[in-house]
Amino acid sequence: MIMQFLVKAHDGENMLEKRMAVRPRHLEGMANLGKHIVCAGGLLDDEGKMKGSVLVLEFPDRAALDEYLNNEPYVVEGVWEKIVVENMNVVIMNGEKVR
């Protein structure tokens, strides 16, 4: 069975420069995740600068998600300071029922 997870990750203080330096490796890793990604994007502050990330991911279980997170460049490099993970069930996407 495939499980869906909502991952909300907040950057640490003053991490924008480091985030941007690590971003190419983050995006490469995301590209390698392929169909594990339901959707993903950056959280923005009031000035439109990135301050975190939101991802909806599919994995067989929480252990597989944790394995991904333990190797995620933003985690390894200390960009993400606080990560909240919740189980999720996407029902509607782009206005269409998917489950």
Task: Label each PLM-derived region with a short phrase.
Residues 1-99:
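Conserved, structured core segments of small domains
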